């Protein structure tokens, strides 16, 4: 039996707004097709991957940022955006691998809960491939992947009509001081870390990408195909 096919779109370093616009484009395409899988042959959706070009704080469905917080964060030179994903406030920026899978869960045999678990397993597997054996997922409200008491990968998703959006953010060489201006994901008393900090050397998004794609294919049990046009 052939594996579901997911289209891979590597955007490189782009502004967060460009990622959201492309995500919305693919959401409309997949949700408009009443028969799963017929839009693009056997494709189960698209995997949008990028490195954010600038600092941006985002709020989720469980809570955003107050007007006062928004003003303060923008004064730091960061963009502030409300999103439709689950979770609370977090940070995205250069040195971070940002992955938004826009997938038809029916074609992957997944439900929302198992989709989130697969994203966590993908990040854990990536850490293992990079030589970090202690990464683990934790139950809500600690959704994501952790090294000890520090989160290395944040996860927040949305799902409507079986189609997912948003996804995971893995800190590779992220400037972690940006997280000091918020309570990441609303979790008081916890910290954040990165692959660079854990491995004590510079680990770039470009270096991590091959391991990430291996981990994604393993955990989602799919085939990835790369195409030139993102749309």
Curated annotation (Swiss-Prot):
GO cellular component: mitochondrion
GO molecular function, one term: ligase activity
Keyword Mitochondrion found: yes
SUPFAM superfamilies associated with the record: Class II aaRS and biotin synthetases (SSF55681)
Keyword line: Acyltransferase, Ligase, Mitochondrion, Transferase, Transit peptide
N6-succinyllysine sites (modified residues): 43
InterPro entries named among the record's database cross-references: aa-tRNA-synth_II/BPL/LPL, BPL_LPL_catalytic, Octanoyltransferase
Tree of life domain: Eukaryota
Record domain BPL/LPL catalytic: where: 41-224
Binding site for substrate: 85-92, 154-156, 167-169
Pathway in which the depicted protein is active: Protein modification; protein lipoylation via endogenous pathway; protein N(6)-(lipoyl)lysine from octanoyl-[acyl-carrier-protein]: step 1/2
Localization of this protein: Mitochondrion
UniProt-annotated catalytic positions: 185 (acyl-thioester intermediate)
Enzyme type, top EC level: transferase
Annotated EC: 2.3.1.181
UniProt site positions, description: Lowers pKa of active site Cys: 151
Keyword Transit peptide listed: yes
Catalytic activity: octanoyl-[ACP] + L-lysyl-[protein] = N(6)-octanoyl-L-lysyl-[protein] + holo-[ACP] + H(+)
GO biological process annotation, one example: protein lipoylation
Family membership noted in the UniProt record: Belongs to the LipB family.
Additional record remark: In the reaction, the free carboxyl group of octanoic acid is attached via an amide linkage to the epsilon-amino group of a specific lysine residue of lipoyl domains of lipoate-dependent enzymes.
Protein task: Catalyzes the transfer of endogenously produced octanoic acid from octanoyl-acyl-carrier-protein onto the lipoyl domains of lipoate-dependent enzymes such as the protein H of the glycine cleavage system (GCSH). Lipoyl-ACP can also act as a substrate although octanoyl-ACP is likely to be the physiological substrate.
Protein name in the entry: Octanoyl-[acyl-carrier-protein]:protein N-octanoyltransferase LIPT2, mitochondrial
Lineage of producing organism: Eukaryota, Metazoa, Chordata, Craniata, Vertebrata
Gene of this entry: Lipt2
């Amino acid at each position: 039996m052939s594996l579901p096919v997911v289209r891979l779109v590597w955007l490189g370093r782009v502004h967060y707004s460009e990622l959201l616009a492309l995500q919305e484009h693919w959401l409309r395409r997949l949700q408009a097709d009443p028969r799963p899988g017929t839009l693009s042959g056997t494709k189960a959706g698209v995997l949008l991957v990028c490195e954010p070009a600038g600092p941006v704080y985002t709020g989720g469905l469980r809570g955003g940022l107050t007007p006062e917080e928004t003003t303060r964060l923008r004064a730091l030179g960061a963009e502030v955006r409300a999103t439709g994903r689950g979770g609370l406030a977090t940070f995205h920026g250069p040195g971070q691998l940002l992955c938004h899978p826009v997938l038809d869960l029916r074609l992957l045999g997944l439900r929302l809960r198992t989709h989130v678990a697969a994203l966590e397993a993908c990040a854990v597997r990536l850490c293992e491939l990079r030589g970090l054996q202690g990464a683990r997922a934790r139950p809500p409200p600690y959704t994501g992947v952790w090294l000890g008491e520090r989160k290395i990968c944040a996860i927040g998703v949305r799902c409507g009509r079986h189609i997912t959006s948003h996804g995971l953010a893995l800190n590779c060489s992220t400037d972690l001081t940006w997280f000091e201006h918020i309570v990441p994901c609303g979790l008081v008393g916890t910290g954040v870390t990165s692959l660079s900090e854990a491995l004590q050397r510079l680990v770039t998004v470009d270096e991590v990408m091959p391991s990430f794609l291996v981990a994604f294919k393993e955990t989602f049990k799919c085939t990835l195909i790369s195409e030139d046009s993102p749309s």
